[in-house]
């Protein structure tokens, strides 16, 4: 914060347009990943390095190869839960390493050092978890359909049908079957659904 307050006006004006372009590209990139609302954003802190990287890349971010690597970096940050602490040092490393990776150099540490444990899925129960939000977005990105309408969750359906993450097997049914809340409230028993479909279920 202090660094921003100490920023001279001339330096701000020099990078103002580039910073804005980076943020606009970041929003487009997130929409490609089916992340449409701030409430569904795994890490707000990851937007800063994402915008800086996209500003640095310019229009080259639109190339399939670059986008695939950017998605790999982004999801590793989310599922490695790397932007929850020590954000400044992680951001600085990513802003330096990711553009070099896109130009043929070594993988950034955010990609090369991450290990995701599958048993972690059982402990994701609330929106406070970045990985919980990430699973929801990935389900939509990978082609999840609404059970009632059969529609995929593009941005039109997402907003028009009031899509949110809901239980697959209803809580009451799970209780009747003797299934514990630790299981039925985890991300394993959740999927995106429209408001109406969820009400019918």
Locate predicted features.
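Short, well-structured alpha-helical interface segments that form or flank functional binding sites
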Residues: 42-45, 65, 160-163, 185-189
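A cross-family structural signal marking well-folded subdomains
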Residues: 1-120
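Short beta-strand-alpha-helix junction that forms the catalytic/metal-binding core
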Residues: 163, 175-199
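A general structural signal for short secondary-structure junctions and capping/turn motifs
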Residues: 39-41, 154-156, 182-185, 198-200
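Intrinsically disordered, low-complexity N-proximal targeting/linker segments that flank membranes
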Residues: 78-166, 173
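A broadly conserved detector of short glycine/acidic/proline-rich loop/turn motifs that flank catalytic sites
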Residues: 54, 144-145, 169, 174-175, ...
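Generic hydrophobic alpha-helical scaffold/packing signal
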Residues: 27, 51, 67, 71, ...
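Substrate-binding/catalytic groove segments of enzymes
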Residues: 60, 200-201
């Amino acid at each position: 914060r202090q660094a921003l307050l100490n920023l001279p006006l001339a330096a701000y004006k020099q990078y103002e347009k580039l910073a804005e372009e980076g943020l606009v590209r970041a929003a487009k990139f997130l929409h490609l990943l089916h992340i449409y609302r701030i409430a569904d954003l795994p890490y707000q802190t990851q937007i800063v390095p994402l915008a800086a990287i996209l500003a640095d890349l310019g229009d080259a971010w639109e190339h399939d190869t670059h986008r695939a690597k950017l998605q790999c970096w982004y999801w590793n940050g989310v599922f490695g839960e790397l932007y929850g602490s020590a954000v400044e040092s992680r951001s600085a490393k990513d802003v330096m390493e990711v553009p070099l990776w896109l130009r043929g150099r070594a993988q950034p540490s955010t990609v090369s050092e991450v290990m995701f444990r599958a048993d972690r899925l059982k402990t994701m129960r609330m929106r406070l978890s970045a990985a919980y939000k990430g699973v929801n977005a990935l389900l939509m990105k990978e082609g999840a359909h609404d059970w009632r309408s059969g529609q995929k969750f593009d941005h039109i359906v997402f907003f028009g049908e009031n899509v949110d993450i809901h239980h697959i097997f209803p809580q009451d049914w799970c209780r009747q079957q003797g299934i514990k809340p630790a299981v039925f409230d985890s991300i394993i028993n959740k999927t995106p659904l429209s408001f109406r479909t969820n009400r019918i279920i």
